[in-house]
């Protein structure tokens, strides 16, 4: 986090208005403005582990990562600055949660890129904090309102589920493939053979679909799942529990919290971080896998066919093979050998 996003640059045009404000920053926190903004007090709340990592270096205990905000996160705050994400259900979940805790009369600012659908904030908050557009620049909109009524928020009401091949998949807003199995994961699943053994790490686990499907056919497999998203971590735990499966699930920025080595690493890595295209996570995954695979261990990932992963795989492992493909997706496989760059 260094350069400011367009949304933050729009906020900075109004920085004088916030000098006396006690602000909670939330939503898609793509930069370190919450740590550098001149105001009376600044807190941040995020569902994204990598955003918490970056901000906690400067903000310490004034930034918190969790599935839901708590009363302590909004303590003494009189202003919410919410960065609109590209996922509307995620925005609704977070805003209903946070506004259920903010005191009536609080200032509510929503900022985001026009292409993210930030205009949806107006109808979404109409019953709680009617918004007016106060600025438009850098292809972003900035909206302001005052909290007139706290919404009701119950985490239980936000859970959803679907079924795949007899498995119950539990999910929450903001989790990848919330409404059903995506085509890429489906292709990767088709390559996993029954009776797989050993330790398997599922990076970017989402709702836990890949791990649950693998374990249902391979009861001797030992699962570890991780994701940057708090909703994904909770959804994966719930998916495993719903199907009577066991596994360790935790938040991690790719390998940041991962210990030890594995016999297989599987992933459908993201190539977007919020609204921005980013191959960072996938590059970190491929290059870091050599430090977390046993000798003879395998990395198996699915990706959009146009992404430049073959080059990174070859640079890191010395070779790769395509074991399944469609017009849009490819499943890549490579193995930990002596020629891999550790």
Swiss-Prot record:
Query: What EC number(s) does this enzyme carry?
Result: 2.1.1.172
Per the record, the domain of life is: Bacteria
User: Which catalytic reaction applies to this protein?
Assistant: guanosine(1207) in 16S rRNA + S-adenosyl-L-methionine = N(2)-methylguanosine(1207) in 16S rRNA + S-adenosyl-L-homocysteine + H(+)
Q: Which UniProt keywords apply?
A: Cytoplasm, Methyltransferase, rRNA processing, S-adenosyl-L-methionine, Transferase
Among the Pfam families in the record, one is MTS
Protein location: Cytoplasm
Report the GO molecular function annotations: 16S rRNA (guanine(1207)-N(2))-methyltransferase activity; nucleic acid binding
InterPro entries to which the protein is assigned, alphabetical: DNA_methylase_N6_adenine_CS (IPR002052), Mtase_sm_N (IPR013675), rRNA_ssu_MeTfrase_C (IPR023543), RsmC/RlmG (IPR046977), SAM-dependent_MTases_sf (IPR029063), Small_mtfrase_dom (IPR007848)
Location, primary (coarse class): cytoplasm
Gene Ontology, cellular component aspect: cytoplasm
Which Gene3D superfamilies does the annotation name? Vaccinia Virus protein VP39
> What family is it from?
Belongs to the methyltransferase superfamily. RsmC family.
Q: What does this protein do?
A: Specifically methylates the guanine in position 1207 of 16S rRNA in the 30S particle.
The subunit structure is:
Monomer.
Name the UniProt record assigns to this protein: Ribosomal RNA small subunit methyltransferase C
Q: Which gene encodes it?
A: rsmC
């Amino acid at each position: 986090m260094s350069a400011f996003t367009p949304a933050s640059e729009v906020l900075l045009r109004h920085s004088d208005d916030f000098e006396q404000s006690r602000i909670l920053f939330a939503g898609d926190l793509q930069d370190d403005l919450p740590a550098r903004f001149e105001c009376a007090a600044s807190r941040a709340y995020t569902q994204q582990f990598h955003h918490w990592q970056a901000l906690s270096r400067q903000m310490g205990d004034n930034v918190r990562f969790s599935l839901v905000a708590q009363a302590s996160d909004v303590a003494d705050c009189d202003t919410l600055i919410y960065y609109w994400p590209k996922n509307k259900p995620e925005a609704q979940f977070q805003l209903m949660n946070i506004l259920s805790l903010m005191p009536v009369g609080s200032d509510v600012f929503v900022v985001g890129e026009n292409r993210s659908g930030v205009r949806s904030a107006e109808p979404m908050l109409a019953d709680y904090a009617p918004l007016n557009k106060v600025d438009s620049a850098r292809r972003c909109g900035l909206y302001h309102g005052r909290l007139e009524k706290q919404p009701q928020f119950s985490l239980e009401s936000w859970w959803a589920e679907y079924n795949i091949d007899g498995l119950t998949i539990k999910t929450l807003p903001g989790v990848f493939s919330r409404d059903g199995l995506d085509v890429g994961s489906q292709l990767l699943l088709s390559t996993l053979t029954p009776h797989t053994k050993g330790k398997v790490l599922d990076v970017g686990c989402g709702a836990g679909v890949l791990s649950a499907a693998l374990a249902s056919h391979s009861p001797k497999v030992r699962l570890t799942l991780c994701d940057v998203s708090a909703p994904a971590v909770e959804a994966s735990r719930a998916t495993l529990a719903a199907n009577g499966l066991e596994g360790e699930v935790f938040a991690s920025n790719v390998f940041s919290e991962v210990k030890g080595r594995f016999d297989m690493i599987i992933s459908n890595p993201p190539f977007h971080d919020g609204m921005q295209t980013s191959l960072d996570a996938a590059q970190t995954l491929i290059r870091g896998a050599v430090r977390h695979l046993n000798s003879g261990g395998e990395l198996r990932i699915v990706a959009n066919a146009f992404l430049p992963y073959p080059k990174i795989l070859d640079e890191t492992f010395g070779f790769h093979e395509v074991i399944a493909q469609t017009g849009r997706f490819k499943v890549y496989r490579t193995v930990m050998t002596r020629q891999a760059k550790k």
